[in-house]
């Protein structure tokens, strides 16, 4: 599912529109529910086989994601690269209270589609998909299931996987009800 890099910035205060805010610290980290769940499980040494499935760009953010998967020994054979879009990323502004605001560029995640999930390793038992509303190809309509993501989840259940789903918080997105409910 969703794979991205968060470029996280600590700011002195949230600026008024058109004004400058000082960044006091910056770092990057992985983002996206499926990627972060995989890396957390790997760090916990839970003993489960872990496999990433996603689409990233041919860029430094994509290189960073692959390096993190390698560092924690997560199978990345199903992570594909594309030259048609950059790796998805967010600029995350964190104010002194810890409140975060995300400026997001969907990038390659928009292109991730059903064929990426064909013939997954049968040793895997849990399938986690995220984030709906940021996976444009999987959010497309499907005559039988409503959306392509619903088709994917049904296929995974039919193959014996326990499935889970994560949604992104997008205030006022008119697609929420038809895609999620």
What are these regions (language model features)?
Residues 1-4, 67-81, 85, 92-181:
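Ribokinase/PfkB-type carbohydrate-kinase core domain
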Residues 31, 85-88:
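Short, basic and Ser/Thr-rich N-terminal targeting/leader segments
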């Amino acid at each position: 599912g969703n794979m991205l890099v968060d470029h996280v910035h600590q700011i002195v205060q949230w600026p008024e529109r058109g004004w400058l805010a000082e960044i006091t610290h910056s770092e990057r980290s992985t983002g996206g529910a499926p990627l972060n769940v995989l890396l957390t499980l790997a760090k916990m040494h839970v003993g489960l086989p872990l496999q990433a499935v996603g689409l990233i760009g041919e860029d430094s953010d994509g290189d960073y994601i692959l390096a993190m998967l390698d560092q924690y020994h997560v199978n990345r054979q199903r992570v594909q690269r594309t030259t048609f879009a950059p790796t998805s990323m967010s600029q995350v502004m964190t104010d002194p209270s810890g409140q975060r605001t995300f400026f997001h560029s969907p990038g390659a995640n928009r292109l991730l589609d059903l064929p990426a999930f064909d013939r997954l390793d049968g040793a895997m038992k849990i399938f986690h998909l995220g984030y709906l509303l940021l996976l444009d190809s999987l959010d497309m309509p499907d005559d039988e299931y409503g959306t392509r993501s619903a088709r994917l989840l049904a296929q995974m259940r039919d193959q014996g996987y326990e499935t889970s789903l994560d949604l992104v918080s997008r205030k006022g997105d008119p697609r929420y009800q038809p895609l999620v409910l």
